[in-house]
UniProtKB/Swiss-Prot annotation:
Segments of skewed composition (Basic residues): 20-36
Protein name: Apoptosis-enhancing nuclease
Keyword Hydrolase: yes
InterPro entries tied to this protein: Exonuclease_RNaseT/DNA_pol3, REXO1/3/4-like, RNaseH-like_sf, RNaseH_sf
Free-text function comment from the UniProt entry: Exonuclease with activity against single- and double-stranded DNA and RNA. Mediates p53-induced apoptosis. When induced by p53 following DNA damage, digests double-stranded DNA to form single-stranded DNA and amplifies DNA damage signals, leading to enhancement of apoptosis.
Motif, Nucleolar localization signal: chain positions: 21-29
Segments forming domain Exonuclease: 105-261
Subcellular location field: Nucleus; Nucleus, Nucleolus
UniProt organism field: Rattus norvegicus (Rat)
Major subcellular site: nucleus
Motif Nuclear localization signal, residue range(s) on this chain: 160-183
GO BP field: intrinsic apoptotic signaling pathway in response to DNA damage by p53 class mediator; response to ionizing radiation; RNA processing
Location of region: Disordered: 1-102, 272-332
Length: 332
């Protein structure tokens, strides 16, 4: 007896039904896993809302510091629930402040132009601020308070055309300081940037990348006082920056500084924490007040750096002389 052939349409319908059945099973398994996960999360949430005897209640969402990302909050809650140290001590003890999250870190770099006699006075002409992850938070050209004498394009990358869309210094200063206040600021030779901004940042919240080689125990060639960001990037990050003859890019420099900081972030923050515990009253010198180191960068012409230091000393001597003359002329 010859078997009867099955119509092709029937085979197609069988295959279609088989595929649909497999998809349904796959979706059912996914749905089961989803429901099981949902039930587990709901159970954990209910346990955290009503702590048992001896268990520490988790902080409510309103207690979470502003600026923390939602994903970070979920991770922190999961760690808190799964941690082994869930018992509260009978006697309350002071707790250390939690380590700052990535949102508390920014990197900055500024480019200056020359104003005043022979262009020896450095004023801010561009400022860039990037986040911990390298996102550009701020990047604007800034019009100095005095007329520009020397654009220093070879180093600053600033040209006359950039000033057409520049904003006044006072406006830029307010915008930038709003980003910096309360943050840990990363940068290279930050005393230059803070000097240009006419701003003093707390020393405990400064991470100057000129200190990075010391934390990595690098050769003396990288630990000299005037080590450049370009050399650090090449030797530690294996990347080339500040190439060509069009000047620096403040965005690139700020990103590079943040990458250098992240190389030694753990060691650096441990050192900062241990120093704060050992000497809570000693916050260290503030780099923004170090006038003698202003313009101390190998990319600036040596005569320009020397003249700047000379002008600073002359201004200090002149101020001291005026104060002494005022004291002598004051009535008894």
């Amino acid at each position: 007896m010859v078997p009867r052939e099955v119509p092709e349409s029937s085979l197609t319908s069988l295959k279609t039904k088989d595929v649909a059945r497999r998809r349904h099973k796959r979706r059912s398994r996914q749905h089961q896993r989803f429901m099981a996960r949902k039930a587990l999360l709901q159970e954990q949430e209910s346990l955290s809302m009503v702590p048992g005897p001896g268990l520490c209640p988790l902080p409510s969402p309103t207690q979470t510091p502003a600026g923390t990302e939602a994903s970070g909050n979920r991770k922190q809650r999961t760690k808190a629930r799964s941690g082994s140290k869930g018992l509260c001590s009978k006697r309350p003890v002071p707790r250390e402040a939690p380590s700052s999250g990535p949102s508390k870190y920014v990197a900055i770099d500024c480019e200056m132009v020359g104003t005043g006699p022979q262009g020896r006075v450095s004023e801010l002409a561009r400022c860039s601020v990037v986040s911990y992850s390298g996102d550009v938070l701020y990047d604007k050209y800034i019009r100095p308070e005095m007329p520009i004498v020397d654009y220093r394009t070879r180093w600053s990358g600033i040209t006359r055309q950039h000033m057409h869309k520049a904003i006044p210094f006072q406006v830029a200063q307010k915008e930038i300081l709003k980003l910096l206040k309360g943050k840990v600021v990363v940068g290279h030779a930050l005393h230059n940037d803070f000097q240009a901004l006419k701003y003093v940042h707390p020393g405990s919240q400064i991470r100057d990348t000129t200190y990075v080689p010391n934390l990595l125990s690098q050769p003396s060639s990288l630990t000299r006082a005037r080590v450049s960001l370009k050399d650090l990037a090449l030797n530690l990050l294996h990347k080339k920056i500040q190439v060509g003859h069009h000047g620096h890019s403040s965005v690139e420099d700020a990103m590079t500084a943040m990458e250098l900081y992240q190389l030694v972030e753990v060691q650096w923050e441990q050192q900062v924490a241990s120093t704060a515990k050992a000497h809570p009253e000693d916050r260290g010198p503030d780099s923004s007040t170090d006038v003698e180191q202003y313009m101390d960068d190998q990319y600036w012409p040596e005569d320009l750096a020397q003249s700047t230091r000379g002008d600073t000393r002359e201004a200090q001597d002149r101020q001291e002389g005026e104060e002494g003359q005022g004291a002598r002329s004051a009535p008894p």
